[in-house]
Amino acid sequence: MELWRQCTHWLIQCRVLPPSHRVTWDGAQVCELAQALRDGVLLCQLLNNLLPHAINLREVNLRPQMSQFLCLKNIRTFLSTCYEKFGLKRSELFEAFDLFDVQDFGKVIYTLSALSWTPIAQNKGIMPFPTEESVGDEDIYSGLSDQIDDTVEEDEDLYDCVENEEAEGDEVYEDLMRSEPVPMPPKMTEYDKRCCCLREIQQTEEKYTDTLGSIQQHFMKPLQRFLKPQDVEIIFINIEDLLRVHTHFLKEMKEALANPGASTLYQVFIKYKERFLIYGRYCSQVESASKHLDRVATAREDVQMKLEECSQRANNGRFTLRDLLMVPMQRVLKYHLLLQELVKHTQDAMEKDNLRLALDAMRDLAQCVNEVKRDNETLRQITNFQLSIENLDQSLAHYGRPKIDGELKITSVERRSKMDRYAFLLDKALLICKRRGDTYDLKDFVNLHSFQVRDDSSGERDNKKWTHMFLLIEDQGAQGYELFFKTRELKKKWMEQFEMAISNIYPENATANGHDFQMFSFEETTSCKACQMLLRGTFYQGYRCQRCRAPAHKECLGRVPPCGRHGQDYSGTMKKDKPHRRAQDKKRNELGLPKMEVCQEYYGLPPPPGAIGPFLRLNPGDIVELTKAEAEQNWWEGRNISTNEVGWFPCNRVKPYVHGPPQDLSVHLWYAGPMERAGAESILTNRSDGTFLVRQRVKDAAEFAISIKYNVEVKHIKIMTAEGLYRITEKKAFRGLTELVEFYQQNSLKDCFKSLDTTLQFPFKEPERRAINKPSAGSIKIFGTAKARYDFCARDRSELSLKEGDIVKILNKKGQQGWWRGEIYGRIGWFPSNYVEEDYSEYC
């Protein structure tokens, strides 16, 4: 048996790889084992399985998503622990890049073999390897780096075996809340079940409030005589505030439960949602509190002895203070689950609706708490970046969340030769560094506020590395970079993250209703002005209007009521031109200047002279509405109707626009004439995916819509008509309906709608061409469906945007708390679980 297969068998015995993982299949290749180990997560868990607590998993990034920086950090943690705690020699250890870049996977197997023969590993009773003469497999390791896919999605099942500290805290919580079993009637009615739910809500609240009282009475007060005031504040945070709030909450809960049918219980939860916001502070600091407690107890034996004494008095030594400090976080995440069960067994329609309001409030609170924890992890990641980058004199946390990092090649206006660089991309900045061992030397700091991304595939060669490139261009055209990537897939991954970062800086609807929304970090927990739900996390939780200071989620910007201060002049702040321009746009139709058609492309070279303004990107066929133009001047200003951007361009790149005669659409196989949505759905429901039609809207004969069958559903896309042009997105406009359809027959709709990754394939009047698809062995498992209750706007490419009413296929519930993995229209990603209603048909 090949050595790598023996290694796989050993990893399964160590409970690191699932027994059914694809690396065990008959046709498995060694590259699949390499891919499973590359991020270092399973290797760190391996050491903890062999020697409990060998590695503090708080120091391991459990979801590195193939970030080179985080993966290498995990791998180096594994290697240093092998040396320090398992006694491996330096010569027995592989180098970090031997695994991450798969430069020498044979050495990785050799290290794992040496680990399997250590006394610690053998004490687990697991047979080391090799135990038999292995087939020579040195040849299969060569060329592995070319087979590894840097863009592969995480295999969620792989991480089932990774310890979860939250689950550990959950066990303490469940133990504390456990009640004596109550005799149940042999056949329970819905009323009986509802009574059980109400009883559980009250009993667990009583026990939780007692637990808070015990922490204060048996730990906090006795330790005040041993610890400095600042130590007490760090360790116990705002426990006393939590106790006060829950004492009142329990009193009002009991009063509500005493009413017939507990009909006012929902009001208590809604009322206390705002008071429970103090959990934001507690949950953001509890991890630091636990670490500080450990440090103090380790440094002072008298404190350690006092902690043991306190634990004995409080609960006979069953739970330590460290255990109990995790309970508040667990409790606040349980309210929505308790209410969800109560809603399920409530029959009265009005009571059910009222309880749903309480359920929404507690779901929102739980999601807010989960995002605080998630952001704490993100801030740790940013701190690791910060400490590893030399010559960096500003805080990276001011530039948003990390999006992607890794190696690339780069050219700039100053240096045309390709340079090897390492880049870190955040929401608002790109850091270009030179790697020096484990550290990075900052070479350039690019503020993305003034840059745009443009694809350039002209020099790409499929089988040639580092030919896949896109441009990063400054708005003024004075500075720019060419970024080169090893593979087309990596280029696509980076480009998507750049586009997501820029959309976070300049989101759609940022200037809707007279507002001026910008990304913002709120110091206090804040609710969205549009949907009233909480803004999530600890930094850059959402957007704030620079004028009226209204807070909002990214997905809610278009629904915020009109700005209360839209009449004020804020022209002193220069901003990137984006859709929905305000004062300038209102004047443009009053100027009486003609429209022009672009006859030659222009991308900023040569740049506009002096400092007259930004350049305007032009593509042949675009229509430009002039805003400043004099016949004797070589440079004109205009608005590109296709993109809504405003800027300057050479006048010789355009010609007068001539509006053509109306098109005869009936000759096209895709044109259906006047038709409602229902008619389109009846035609397309039983057709193949990709079948489409264009219909005239019955209510307004001047408007059209595309209906397309995609992923078993019929989707409808409104075609907007204005200024003689047709468009389905503000990014691109067409002179005619035929041109629009022809374009999207060749180009995917996902550029307009991220979840609609298809072209317009089959006109509905064509004969059906149905292919028989056999289910593949690796087809995706689905754990049910859910209906989106609200819009959700993804912040990076790992997340899944939702529109209210979307039906989501649930693929996984094992992500970070509060996040599920799902699929819509072929697009897969993570979304907040409180934004959907699972098994919604039962409650609708």
UniProtKB/Swiss-Prot annotation:
SUPFAM superfamilies: Calponin-homology domain, CH-domain (SSF47576), DBL homology domain (DH-domain) (SSF48065), PH domain-like (SSF50729), SH2 domain (SSF55550), SH3-domain (SSF50044)
Residues covered by the SH3 domain: 591-659, 781-841
Origin: domain of life: Eukaryota
Region named Disordered: 567-589
All copies of domain Calponin-homology (CH), residue ranges: 1-119
List of residues that carry Phosphotyrosine: 825, 843
Gene name tied to this protein: VAV1
Protein name stated in the entry: Proto-oncogene vav
One Gene Ontology CC term in the entry: cell-cell junction
A Pfam family that the UniProt record links to this protein: C1_1
CDD domains from the UniProt entry: C1_VAV1 (cd20867), CH_VAV1 (cd21262), PH_Vav (cd01223), RhoGEF (cd00160), SH2_Vav1 (cd10405), SH3_VAV1_1 (cd11979), SH3_VAV1_2 (cd11976)
Miscellaneous comment text of the record: 'Vav' stands for the sixth letter of the Hebrew alphabet.
